[in-house]
Amino acid sequence: MSGFLDFKAVVEQEKLRPVRFTDTGRGRLGKLLKAAREIRGWSIIETEMVTKEYEAALFRTAGEPVPKDVGISNATVSRYERGKLESLDWRSLSLLCFVLKPIDPVTGQALEPTNALYIACEHPPYNDTKLYE
């Protein structure tokens, strides 16, 4: 039991560092999201509508009332695509990944939201410029 308590003390002492997204990383992520949207043949407004429908369906499936602010606005979709968001919102980034299913440049599979964050902050192995040529 003392090992558990020691571990807990160590965890409480750790400090979380902020993640720093780079302009290059946000731009790369934006290009991946835009390419995925264009492959689907959706406009930015259609993408907004699909994210609203997707998130509303999640609430209905869980048996919860659907809030009025579900989905991602077309302005936010546009800012993501241009790499112009100063901070990335986990909810909206996850929705975009689940709805658009951009291709992960490392795995070749659908991009997971966590890996999208790695792209935005140029974390290895997502910092290799050859992946984005």
Question: What label would you give each PLM region?
Answer:
Residues 2-60:
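A short, Lys/Arg-rich alpha-helix, primarily the initiator
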Residues 67-98:
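Short, basic-rich loop-to-helix N-cap that marks the start of a DNA-contacting helix
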Residues 53-75:
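Short, positively charged loop/turn segments that connect secondary-structure elements
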Residues 1-7, 89-117:
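DNA major-groove recognition helix of helix-turn-helix/homeodomain DNA-binding modules
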Residues 43, 54, 73-76, 89, ...:
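Short coil turns linking two alpha-helices in DNA-binding domains
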Residues 36, 50, 80, 119-120:
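Residues in the recognition helix of alpha-helical DNA-binding motifs
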Residues 8-15, 107-133:
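Short, charged recognition helix plus adjacent turn
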